[in-house]
């Protein structure tokens, strides 16, 4: 047992069984589904594009369940990596690992179980999909440690959150075409942009604690940088249409998504914590709008 676990042990021992289950639920962010939705939409974009419509139902189930499992596992390993930092950050000081309600060892077991269940589901698909899941595990497990070494953890998050895209094409088509990699690139740009909103919420705390983020890197040019990222995302999504020939419905979806992004800049233009967090949450609707465009175009 680590020194941290010993120090936090009394907080964990005083909990009833329902309370402990509630702490585990918070640990996997079951009470905050936004992260799963931000991971789900690009995965569904890929499934619908790869299948040219509704994908096989079992494949759809595996990827939908896998989104929740891997996102939950990612949250657990993130909190484990930040268990020394989170007690000193306003937004994260009440997390189960930060308060000691869940020990570091327990968190690692939760991570392992979630990843094993996710891998068991992937194992029912073809071998290319199984092989692609291996770098997916590495991306999910290593992301939390990037903020100590680079100002670009948001880019890495986009790589991790979007890895379901090449896996989806592999599962449906047996290969990953250029279209799949274009969609993956668009997702990296999107995730970097929306997670910068999130990083702006914590910017003052991160500077004080020595953590790194794109919000710190961009500084006073943060809104300009995000505008460029979103513009590049839409440019790459336009290239997706050149490959897939999706038509008017897809462009209507992109148009709605662009209006939603413009609204984010309006509400967060003064960079306050609350509006920046709302702008981050608002990206759920951006992902949904793009998905609806793809789904209608594929009918």
From Swiss-Prot:
Query: Which InterPro entries does this UniProt record tie to the protein?
Result: HB_polyprenyltransferase-like, Prenyltransferase, UbiA_prenyltransferase, UbiA_prenylTrfase_CS, UbiA_sf
Provide the primary localization: membrane
What is the membrane topology here?
A: Multi-pass membrane protein
So where does this one cross the membrane?
A: 34-54, 57-77, 108-128, 163-183, 221-241, 245-265, 277-297
Q: What Gene3D superfamilies would the database entry show?
A: UbiA prenyltransferase (1.20.120.1780)
Under the heading Pfam families, the entry gives: UbiA
GO cellular component, alphabetical, reads: plasma membrane
| Signal sequence segment | none
GO biological process assignments: ubiquinone biosynthetic process
EC category name: transferase
> Could you tell me where this protein is found in the cell?
Cell inner membrane
Record EC number: 2.5.1.39
Name the pathway: Cofactor biosynthesis; ubiquinone biosynthesis
Q: Which reaction does it catalyse?
A: all-trans-octaprenyl diphosphate + 4-hydroxybenzoate = 4-hydroxy-3-(all-trans-octaprenyl)benzoate + diphosphate
Q: Which UniProt keywords apply?
A: Cell inner membrane, Cell membrane, Magnesium, Membrane, Transferase, Transmembrane, Transmembrane helix, Ubiquinone biosynthesis
Write one Gene Ontology MF term. Answer: 4-hydroxybenzoate polyprenyltransferase activity
What does this protein do, in the record's words? Catalyzes the prenylation of para-hydroxybenzoate (PHB) with an all-trans polyprenyl group. Mediates the second step in the final reaction sequence of ubiquinone-8 (UQ-8) biosynthesis, which is the condensation of the polyisoprenoid side chain with PHB, generating the first membrane-bound Q intermediate 3-octaprenyl-4-hydroxybenzoate.
Query: Which HAMAP family does its entry note?
Result: UbiA
Similarity field = Belongs to the UbiA prenyltransferase family.
* Name of the molecule in the record: 4-hydroxybenzoate octaprenyltransferase
- Species annotation: Xanthomonas oryzae pv. oryzae (strain KACC10331 / KXO85)
């Amino acid at each position: 047992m680590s020194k941290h676990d010993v120090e936090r042990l009394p907080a964990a021992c005083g909990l009833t069984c329902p309370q402990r289950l509630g702490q585990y639920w918070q640990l996997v962010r079951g009470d905050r589904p936004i992260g799963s939705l931000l991971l789900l939409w690009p995965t569904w974009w890929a499934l619908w594009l790869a299948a040219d419509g509704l994908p096989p139902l079992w494949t759809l189930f595996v990827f939908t369940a896998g989104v929740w499992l891997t996102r939950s596992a990612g949250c657990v390993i993130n909190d484990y990596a930040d268990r020394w930092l989170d007690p000193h950050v306003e937004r994260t000081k009440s997390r189960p690992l930060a308060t000691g309600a869940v020990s570091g060892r327990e968190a690692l077991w939760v991570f392992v179980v979630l990843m094993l269940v996710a891998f068991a589901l992937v194992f029912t698909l073809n071998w290319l999909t199984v092989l692609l899941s291996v770098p997916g595990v590495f991306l999910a497990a290593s992301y939390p440690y990037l903020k100590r070494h680079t100002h670009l953890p948001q880019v890495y998050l986009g790589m991790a959150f979007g890895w379901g895209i090449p896996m989806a094409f592999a599962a449906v088509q047996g290969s990953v075409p250029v279209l799949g990699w274009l969609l993956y690139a668009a997702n990296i740009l999107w995730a970097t942009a929306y997670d910068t909103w999130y990083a702006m919420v914590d910017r003052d705390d991160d500077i004080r604690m020595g953590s790194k983020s794109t919000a710190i890197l961009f500084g006073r040019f943060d809104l300009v940088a995000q505008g460029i990222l979103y513009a590049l995302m839409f440019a790459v999504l336009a290239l997706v249409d050149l490959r897939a020939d999706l038509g008017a419905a897809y462009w209507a979806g992109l148009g709605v998504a662009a209006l939603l992004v413009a609204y984010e800049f309006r509400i967060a233009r003064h960079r306050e914590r609350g509006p920046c967090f709302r702008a981050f949450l608002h990206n759920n609707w951006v992902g949904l709008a793009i998905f609806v465009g793809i789904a209608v175009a594929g009918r």
